Swiss-Prot record:
Protein name: 3alpha-hydroxysteroid dehydrogenase
Gene Ontology molecular function: 3-alpha-hydroxycholanate dehydrogenase activity
Statement: the UniProt record of this protein carries the keyword Oxidoreductase: yes
Enzyme nomenclature, EC number: 1.1.1.-, 1.1.1.52
Organism: Eggerthella lenta (strain ATCC 25559 / DSM 2243 / CCUG 17323 / JCM 9979 / KCTC 3265 / NCTC 11813 / VPI 0255 / 1899 B) (Eubacterium lentum)
Catalysed conversion reaction: lithocholate + NAD(+) = 3-oxo-5beta-cholan-24-oate + NADH + H(+); deoxycholate + NAD(+) = 12alpha-hydroxy-3-oxo-5beta-cholan-24-oate + NADH + H(+); cholate + NAD(+) = 7alpha,12alpha-dihydroxy-3-oxo-5beta-cholan-24-oate + NADH + H(+); chenodeoxycholate + NAD(+) = 3-oxochenodeoxycholate + NADH + H(+)
pH profile of the protein: Transformation of DCA is more efficient at pH 10 than pH 7.
GO biological process terms on file: bile acid metabolic process
UniProt record similarity statement: Belongs to the short-chain dehydrogenases/reductases (SDR) family.
Length: 259
């Protein structure tokens, strides 16, 4: 069985993904701020470095998959936290364990966002993240940004993350490591429970083509099943994909975009 590392697997989508993988007999390592198998603040360079070092110590023979799921919404939290955790907390963790993935021909999956959130993304912010490696400098530039527009920076980090996957996947794939993104729809998690009123209004204004019983939001298991699959060897032909698991919302909003 495989070794699967998941960030942010204490609750929500991450916890459900971990549950599915464990039921299938895999070893799962949860990296989270609290309550994880490895406790680390992935919004800091020091926290990431510590987690990466521990993974190398525990699994010198390699790991089968890295699922970068940890993140924070844009509701009333510092902009610096949104950027450091959502973007650098994913990309730098993925880079930090690349050699472990390469040893086993593994895969990496990151959590992006669906079309509703991406519509709020600012291309200048996404470009800054994708094209400048200096995290400290970026945080300096956004230190005075009002947290009230955190949803814009949330969307921008997730857009940048999806673009990072597209840019990096050809090189990673040529070295035997697949890199993909999952773009969840509106899911019933603690993050969506704490949405700002304007965020919830925007979410509820778009009808979801696929109905999930009486529930207005998807169950985390819908996302977790897709995440567990795309991280597995059964998805060996999938690389560089941003997979929308949203009940058809992306198709509704972007019906003319075929790829």
């Amino acid at each position: 069985m495989g070794i699967y590392v998941i960030t942010g697997a204490t609750s929500g989508i991450g916890a459900k993904t971990a549950e599915i993988l464990r039921e299938r007999g895999h070893e799962v390592v949860n990296i989270d701020l609290n309550g994880g198998d490895i406790n680390a603040n992935l919004a800091t360079k020091e926290g990431r470095a510590g987690a990466i070092a521990e993974l190398h110590e525990r699994f010198p023979e390699g790991i089968d998959a890295m699922i970068c799921n940890a993140g924070v919404s844009g509701g009333k939290v510092p902009i610096s936290l949104i950027i450091s955790l959502n973007y650098f907390g994913a990309t730098e963790m993925a880079r930090g364990v690349f050699d472990l993935l390469e040893k086993k021909g593994g895969s990496c999956v990151v959590t992006s966002s669906n079309s509703i959130a991406q519509g709020a993304a600012r291309m200048d912010v996404a470009g800054m993240l994708n094209n400048h490696a200096d995290e400290d400098r970026i945080l300096e530039l956004v230190k005075d940004v009002d947290p009230a527009i955190g949803h814009v920076y949330y969307a921008s980090t997730k857009y940048a993350l999806a673009r990072w996957v597209r840019r990096m996947s050809p090189d990673w794939g040529s070295r035997g490591v697949r890199l993909n993104a999952i773009a969840p729809g509106n899911v019933r998690t603690a993050m969506t429970a704490n949405m700002l009123p304007e965020q919830r209004a925007a979410m509820e204004a778009i009808p979801v083509p696929t109905h999930f019983g009486e529930e207005p939001l998807m169950d985390p298991v819908e996302i977790a099943n897709a995440m567990a699959f795309i991280a597995s060897p059964e998805a060996s032909g999938i690389n560089g994909v941003v997979l929308f698991v949203d009940g058809g919302t992306d198709a509704l909003l972007n019906s003319e975009k075929v790829y």
